Amino acid sequence: MKNKTRFALFLAVLCTAAVLAADYFVPLQTDNPDTGQLPAVYDGRKNGRAPAVKNQGSLGTCWAFASLQALEARLLPEESLDFSEDHMSLNNGFCIPQEEGGEYTMSMAYLLSWQGPVLESEDPYGDGTSPKGLKAVKHVQEIQMIPGKDYEKIKRAVLRYGGVQSSLYTAMNGDRSKSDSYNESASAYCYIGSEPPNHDSVIIGWDDGFSKDNFNVPVNGDGAFICMNSWGDGFGDQGFFYVSYYDSNIGMNNIVYSKVEDPGRYDKIYQSDLRGWVGQLGYGNDTAWFSNVYKAEESQYLKAVGFYATAPGTSYEIYAVRQAGKESDITEGYEFDRKIFLADGAFENAGYYTVSFDKKTKKELKLKKGERFAVIVKITTPDTVHPAAIEYDAGDGRTFVDLSDGEGYISADGKVWERVEEKQNCNLCLKAYTAAQ
């Protein structure tokens, strides 16, 4: 093949031990969260959108607490659920003990593959064990990544989705810790420096007038995010604290759980990327074609496809091939000429998105039991050279990848294809969803 594919590593640990049916949205009484004027002060605690404060104890599980507390905030006030951090931190498929921390792409992989969330009552925190066979009580179908330091977008995401998971650096590791960056009397935190983030929390509000004099270090102006921590209610203001807008890391890495559904909209998820977005693959430009071939386990309708946009402004075209042939037919360029157009569009933010095909005719998308079918995506991501998200073993001992469960193909032009498991030692992050009707 003339066009040579290339990898880009994505996974990095950010958090250490220092550390459907309904689209839930609660509008404010005043402004539209997407376009209206932002208030100078917003506090999710006063709007019923802050979940209960929790305590990670001595384990490096802040990433799991922040992820699930942001997810809990997403559902409030209609639903008040307590999700299990133990289950997420013990069943995510990464070779990282609870003591050593984790980061948000691990949370994304766990939730998007329907491994969870499960309820805290089913898997209580801190015992080091996790029951087998627990089912996810919600299905996360979309996670958006808010651009770094875009405070307006972060604030609008807080208004719309309840909480934004974000990262910061701290030398503290619990509610009794001390730090030159933390003013305990004002529950005010600001770190200015070059240390990378090592702790995750949830932004649930802000105060543009929070005085710069509250911080132990000089800052250029007033203003702070109101953040929910995971060190119990003995830390800060009953578990919450104020992080300066001028902190070096807050607002750099941000995710929101933008679409959460009750189980039942889709009956089956087809996937080969349980570890999720570990790296990226491409041909040295911003466009690539990629496809996964699956075998229908039941006679059902193809209802949706899910994949990652690896940077803002990603556009896509989605196709399907019924009765897909054998590998040699695909790699020689014959089989995918029969593709059926399903959808196209674009995403403002990076993240994971599920695109449904409700407007397609049932005849086109009715799969027979045992039928091989292909889902195909043409993706264009501006200013990137590796637009396709992949799961692969980065060689750092943190990721175990099973290449036997996937049949994926990638192409530079949509005509000549190569098998990624054999040629690139990876799985493609491309899921398919089916339902009985």
Which role fits each region the language model picked out?
Residues 6-20:
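Sec-dependent N-terminal signal peptides of Gram-positive bacterial secreted proteins and lipoproteins
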Residues 207, 258-261, 322-324, 430-437:
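Short beta-strand-to-coil "C-cap" segments at the C-terminal boundary of structured domains/repeats
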Residues 313-401:
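Aromatic- and Gly/Pro-enriched, solvent-exposed loop/edge beta-strand patches characteristic
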Residues 56-79:
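Alpha-helical support elements that line or immediately flank enzyme active sites
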Residues 77-87:
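Short, flexible active-site-proximal loops enriched in glycine and acidic residues
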Residues 1-2:
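N-terminal secretory signal peptides that target proteins for export/translocation
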Residues 25-48, 64-72, 89-312, 317, ...:
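Predominantly the structural core of cysteine protease catalytic domains
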Residues 369, 378-437:
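Short, surface-exposed beta-strand/loop patches at domain edges
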